Every structure is written in structure tokens, then in C-alpha cells.
Amino acid sequence: MADTTVEKLATEVGKSVERLIEQFSQAGIKKGHTDNVSEAEKQQLLDYLKKQHGGDNAPTKMTLQRKTVSTLSVAGNGGQSKDVKVEVRKTRTFVKRDANDAVLKAEEEAKAKAEAEAKAKAEAEAKAKAEAEVKAKAEAEAKAKAEAEAKAKAKAAAEVKVIKELSPEAEAARVEAERLKAVQAEATKRKQDEEAAKAAEKARLLAEENSKRWAEEERQRLEAERYSDHHITTSKVARAAEDSSDMDEEKRGRRARNKNTAKSKRGGKDARDGREKHMRNRSTAPESMAHGFNKPVAAVNRDVRIGETVTVAELAHLMAVKATEIIKQMMKMGSMVTINQVLDQETAQLVAEEMGHKVVLIRENELEQQVLSERDEEGVVKLEPRAPVVTIMGHVDHGKTSLLDYIRRAKVAAGEAGGITQHIGAYHVETDNGMITFLDTPGHAAFTAMRARGAKATDIVVLVVAADDGVMPQTIEAIQHAKAGNVPLIVAVNKMDKPEADIDRVKSELAQHGVMSEDWGGDNMFAFVSAKTGAGVDDLLEGILLQAEVLELKAVRDGMAAGVVIESQLDKGRGPVATILVQEGTLRQGDIVLCGLEYGKIRAMKDENGRSITEAGPSIPVEILGLSGVPSAGDEATVVRDERKAREVALYRQGKFRDVKLARQQKSKLENMFANMTEGEVKELNIVLKADVQGSLEAITDSLMGLSTDEVKVNIIARGVGALTETDATLAAASNAIMVGFNVRADAQARKTIESESVDLRYYSVIYNLIDEVKAAMTGMLSPEFKQQIIGLAEVRDVFKSPKLGAIAGCMVTEGTIKRSAPIRVLRDNVVIFEGELESLRRFKDDVNEVRNGMECGIGVKNYNDVRVGDQIEVFETVEVARTL
């Protein structure tokens, strides 16, 4: 085929000339519009395009599997037939040859063809040569035969001539001799022909037999390759699967063995013959009954892929060993486990490496990462300025909520129980210079986790310090949270309207903890305010906005929202309610939210004042309804696209949380197993705790768990958000627990159960009272403490002998009162030499119960006669002392 131009080739393939020239260039060929294209260049371009479009990546091998199930009817016990299923699995592999293989195959075929032609040519030449030799030999034989016939004729003519001259008797004898000679030659020739025919027939039969045998062997080999993975393991099924000839042979062998056994009982030669035949029969047993497995002699080291949690059974499957081997190994390592025990990743890694395997640690949150990666915003990300998130922190009763209340111009502090904040309040305030979002955190010591969460989600921390009170423990803790979160700190010195205000004291105390005023050369801004009169509040807001400008706070406004859960609760009428601080994007009603272990579609949104809204931008706190459950405070809230995938991720997180929790608990149990054995009996105070919001529940739980001692342990057997239910009451009755409700009440069914079971139910609205009463209950459970108190002291002045009581000490009571029923100690030179009890106490001759200070008496000490003058007798009693925590 003649070369064609680039333009003509572009017209043929239906592409533009520029695109074709570009593809030639990518393939390494430089061409112009009018250049010619050879066949080799076309092939080069075609190979390049195939490689680019995945031609080389196509699979070269395909394996097909087919499974057939058949039923065999075999004879069972008692002559009954039994159906056995036989499963046959067939595997066939097709291999696709690539271009190089095709070329090599073509070359091999050409070479084989040339060899076959050469061989055929050589065979033809040999055949022609053989035919020529046969023809020459035949001609020579014909010539010799003709000469012989000519000689015979000449001889016959001569003989005839002679015969004519002979007598008639001689002629008859000659004819008879010739006849006999011809008969003998004919018989010899017939015998040779018969022998040749027999030899040819024998060779033909042998060739046919060999051909059949070779074909049968080839067929058996192919069948063996096709069914190499199929084994019949049951002996009855194996016999049923054998062909009839093998079964007949086995039956004949069995009958022969039975006969030999009968003969062997007679002993002698029959026994020896029987044993020999038995051995021969055993040697001819079918090989299909032999076991085909040999135990591996070398250890196999595998790459074991371990997730975050794994059970003992799953780990055994990964390492291809029995679960008992892992249990033995862990017993050697000092741990008692069961086959369904959940192991954490670290423990499983130690076990696998101890058994000689290589461990590959994997993370199982691929679906989670995929769902979160799919929410990336489309197009160009546009950052816009956002409002600062300010957290108000400080010690309890230093005026945090009052200051924020003045800023919001609403009475919030009066509505808080006890006048203190017990959960995070999120508000946003519009000022003349812009919007500010405030997070009001509790100041009580119990709310450490809530304050830490507030510092994590914030941009600026405002530390409120009372001018008359100074730096307190929670003030120091707030400073530590701000430093840990690397958050700018602004100090608001409150209660400046009080006459006891001391600014210099506050500055010096804060300086001891690394908070230096700008006046003293530090970096922290100080604002002196009064939440009561409002003095200095404008300066504080101006300082907050100035600090926000320095930080250059920006966020994506358009796109899918993400934020953090500030607070969560279970509302009886609305269900799970979560307060979310939006950090980026816009949260809209109807979005699908993945929130920690929970998920759901937003059914309603409300701002901090309870008004319904449809969307919320960055730095806006909002309440959402529609989650599947109450999320934990501090969880990240993310909007995703697919609700089904969100549910899968939430379920995966729940399962992982449960497995990790169980593994951690089990690890703790194993580590503390021997320590627990040595501990004595520990009393437990069981509590069923319900609170109004998640943050308060966390704070109360941490505070109560911190009250536990070596003798009394606080055990919170159930906790949750929402009202006290009948289930809670039943659980409390069964576990002998007290029910505690913090800003929640029991429903009607729960109250009936509480009355019928006489459960101790207590309501609280201030955390101080709750902790104090639980502490009092724990104090009542403490084991009593006993103390010995001296009630009297007598000095021995003389010793008398009594036939009944032995030595009687004549004493003078110098201190307190001597009582007959009390135990005593005998002191000599202020050293205790005997401890016992009084046997008799007399004044003059009368028995008395007690003798007071300054009186004389006679004292008989039981089982002690070594009383001397100058000894002291000390009388004491054991009193119970109430213990406190």
C-alpha cells in the first residue's frame, strides 16, 4: 500500500489535522500537514494509542469456575441406602496472548511448518528412492526370470528333442517328477503367504492397542488436571465413586482375605499361605483410599493485617492457627482470654509477633474518610471575614454571666439555678462595630471538661477576675486552658464598683501565672469593668474586636457546613437536641449531618433565643433537631451528601467505640487482676444519674467518680440525658441504687415503681448540694473507727493476799473513775506490763461498781498476781469515732 499524507489520514479516521499531528508528536513522530505517513509510522501511532487507552492494562488471564452437585446413593448400615452429595468444582483458565506472544507464536508456527515441509520432502525423497530401488530390483528379477525362462525353454527344447529320441517309459517318469516338484513349490509358497498375513495382522492389532492405550492415558491425564481440586473424603462415598471394575476387584480381595482368615485359624501351611495372600491382597488395594495430606515441616510466616480491634478467633484465622494456640501463647504472656475475647491492636500485635508473624497495622475508617472527602466545596474557595468566638471564663461567682447579661441586655443570671451557670451558654451579640459570639462556661470546679471544650472552640478567651476576690483556683485553670489552646487572653477585672476592689493585687497575682498587663510590659489586654453599672463594657468590646482584627479571622461562607457540638440534651417533646457552633460553611435546614456517633437530617433549627431559622453561617450558635440520638459534647458536626453513607459511618463509629471500650476494659481487668485479688471488700454506692444536658452530666459524673476512696467507691450504673423513666427505677431497685435527677423529674410510671420498690429518689438543681449529699452518704458507709479513751488511774499503795482472789492491790484513785466492767492495764515505771480485766472492785468490804477520784479501793486483777507497790492501774474504754471523707 502506498504512503498517504497526514491530511488524507485525518479525513479517513475522522479527526482534525491538528489533533492527529498532536498525537503523532506525543508518539514521538514529527509531522506536518502535507507530510507522508508510512505504514511503520501508522503502526507506531496505533501502538502508542493502545497503550494510552489502557490496551496494555487489559487482563491477560481469565479464570472460570463451575460447581456441580450430584447425589450418590450408597449402601448404609442395616442394608439401607444413603444419599450422599458430591460436589465437583471445575476451574478453567483462559490466557490472552499479547502482540509479542502472537509474533513469537507465528515464528514458532513458521519454523514448525518449515521443519514439517523439510521432513515431508525428505520422506518423499526416501520414498522415491525406495520405489526406484524396488523398481530396479523388479526389473532385474524380471530380466533374470526372462533369461531363466529362455534357458528353460532352450533346455526343454533340447530335452524334447532328447525325449523324442527316448523311449515311452522314460518319458512317463520324467512327467511324474515334474508334477511332484510343482506341487511341492506351491505348498511352500502358500505357507509363506499365510505366515506373512499373520504377521501383518498381529502388527495391526498391536498398533491399534497402543493407540487406544495412549489415547486413554491422555484422557485420564486431562481429567486429572481438570478435577485436581476435587477429593472424596468419606470411604463409602469413595467406594461409590469408583468404577465397577475397581469395586469388583476390591470385593474379590475381601472374599480372598476372609478365606485366608478362615484358613489361618487351622495353622500350619494354610496359615502361612493365608498370610502371604493377605499381603498380596493388601498390596493391590485401591490407591484412591490413601490419605493425601502431608504435614508441613517448615514454619510459615505470614503478613497479618490487624485492625483496631480483633477477637481471638479472628486473629487465629488470620494467622492460620487454632485459637487454642493463641490462648496458650497469651497464657504464657500472663493473660487469660477466651475465644471470643476482643483484643486491642497493641495486644494483638504483641501476640502475632511473638508467634513469628509480620504484623501490618491497618486503619478501618476508609469509608469515613471517603464520606468526609466527598463534601469538599466545588469551585474556588472564597474566604470571607467572620465574627470572633469569645469564651467567658473565670472562677465561680466572679460575675461572668452577669457581665454577658449586661452585654446582651437580658436577665439570664437570675434564671440560673443558685445563680451560677451549669452548662455552656452560646449567644451572639450585634454591636456597633460588628457581631461577637460569646460562650459562657461554668466556673465551678466540677466543670473542667466543659471549660476545656469552650477553650478549644474559641478564638479569644476573656478571663473574668473579681477585683475584690483576686485569683482563685478556677482562674488559674482557665489560664492553663487558654495557654494549652494557644488562644489570646483578655483579662476583664469585674466588680470595680465595690470599695474593696484592689487592681494592683489582681495584676500581681495574675503576673505570677504568666499573665502580664500591657502597662507592666506584657502582651495581655486588661479591661476594668462593672457588670452592675456597665462601666468599661464598651472598652472591653472594643478590645475584643481589635484583637479579632489582628487575628484576621476568615472562613468559607458558601458550601457545606462544619462545626462543633457545644451542648446536647434530650427534650421530651422534641427528641435529641444539639447546640452546634458553626465554624465554616452555611448550615441549612434539611442538611444531612454526621455528628460523632449520631447522624440525621435537620428537621428544625433555632437560635439561642428560641426563634426558628432556616440557615446559620460561620460563628453562629444554633440548636438543631432531627439527630438519631444525643451526641457527645465536643463532637465534630459535619454536613455530608449521602444519608445512607452517613448512617454506615455512624454505625461503624458506634461499633468501633464499643469494641475499643471493651478492649480497654478487658486490658484494665487483665492488668489489675492480681491487684484486685489482694484488695479487701470495697463498699459501693450505686447511683442512677439523669441530667438535663450532656455537659452537666459529664461534670457531675467526673465529680462523683472523684469522690471514690479505697473503702467506698461511687459506681454510676446508669446515666443519661432526659427524664427519669420506669427502666431507670427498675434498674435502681434491682441494684440497690439511689436515683439522682439534676434539673429533671421522674415520669408517672417511674414514680409508681419508685413508690412500690421504695427507691431513694433525690432531685437537685445546684451541683454543690448534690456533691455534698453524696459525700454524706459515702461517709455513712465508711467502716467505724474505734479509739481507746482512759477513764481512770489508780496507784497501788499496798498489796494484800486473799485465799480466794490471790493478790489484792490497795489503791488510791488519782484520776477519773475506776469502773468494774472496764478493761485495765498495769503499768510499772510507766511501762505496760499487763493488760486484762478487773476481777473484783471493793471499797472497804463492799463490792462496788465504780470508785471516784480521791477514794481508796481494793482491786483484784484477773489471772495476775504480780502486783507490786508503786504500780499504776489504768482503766480505759473503747469508743467509736465517726469518720469523714
Swiss-Prot record:
Residues 184-232, 267-276 have a biased composition (Basic and acidic residues). Residues 385-554 form the tr-type G domain. It is found in: Cytoplasm. Residues 253-266 have a biased composition (Basic residues). Residues 440-443 are annotated as: G3. InterPro entries: DNA-bd_dom_put_sf (IPR009061), EF-G-like_DII (IPR053905), EFTu-like_2 (IPR004161), IF2_assoc_dom_bac (IPR013575), IF2_II (IPR044145), IF2_N (IPR006847), P-loop_NTPase (IPR027417), Small_GTP-bd (IPR005225). Residues 530-532 are annotated as: G5. GTP binds at residues 394-401, 440-444, 494-497. Keywords: Cytoplasm, GTP-binding, Initiation factor, Nucleotide-binding, Protein biosynthesis. It comes from the Bacteria. Pfam families: EF-G_D2, GTP_EFTU, GTP_EFTU_D2, IF-2, IF2_assoc, IF2_N. Residues 419-423 are annotated as: G2. Residues 394-401 are annotated as: G1. Residues 135-159, 184-289 are annotated as: Disordered. Residues 494-497 are annotated as: G4. The keyword Cytoplasm applies. One of its GO terms (cellular component) is cytosol. Belongs to the TRAFAC class translation factor GTPase superfamily. Classic translation factor GTPase family. IF-2 subfamily. NCBIfam families: IF-2 (TIGR00487), small_GTP (TIGR00231). One of the essential components for the initiation of protein synthesis. Protects formylmethionyl-tRNA from spontaneous hydrolysis and promotes its binding to the 30S ribosomal subunits. Also involved in the hydrolysis of GTP during the formation of the 70S ribosomal complex. This is Translation initiation factor IF-2. It comes from Shewanella sp. (strain MR-4). The gene is infB.
